């Protein structure tokens, strides 16, 4: 597995008083498990045939002690099913869901979340949030120190 440079993300949300339902729902999603998948669900690729009509088969990989170290899905021809990877990069803007939540403060009318993503900010998630929660104010700062780029995602 190739390890990415990590991008730190700090997201501030605000409720204008008329959008409490949207604000509360978005906070719930961001504070939960696998928030990107909850906001913008990934297709269930193990249940979707490839172009040849074949379903991938789960393979469990164990170390010498018999401990599971990885699980992969492969097609009958041995090709790894990497459709999830391409879908995530194309739709979320990063290959994995958020990692290492380091802040999650939610108070009356505002919230702040901090987390890491692989390589870059998740542009697709930001766009989906703006689309699905249009009345929630959002400020999204990112910093990728390995490649020395940082900034705010545009509103």
State what each model feature region is.
Residues 3-155:
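Long, contiguous binding/interaction regions
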């Amino acid at each position: 597995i190739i390890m990415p440079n990590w991008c730190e993300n700090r997201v501030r949300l605000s409720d204008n008083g008329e959008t409490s339902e949207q604000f509360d729902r978005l906070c719930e999603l961001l504070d939960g498990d696998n928030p990107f998948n909850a906001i913008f669900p990934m297709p269930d690729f193990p249940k979707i045939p490839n172009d040849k009509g074949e379903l991938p088969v789960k393979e469990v990989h164990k170390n010498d002690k018999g401990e599971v170290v990885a699980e992969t899905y492969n097609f009958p021809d041995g090709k790894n099913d990497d459709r999830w990877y391409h879908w995530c990069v194309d739709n979320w803007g990063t290959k994995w869901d958020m990692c290492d939540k380091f802040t999650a403060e939610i108070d009356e009318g505002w919230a702040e979340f901090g987390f890491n993503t692989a390589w870059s900010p998740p542009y697709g998630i930001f766009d989906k949030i703006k689309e699905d929660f249009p009345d929630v104010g959002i400020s999204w700062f990112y910093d990728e120190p390995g490649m020395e780029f940082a900034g705010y995602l545009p509103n």
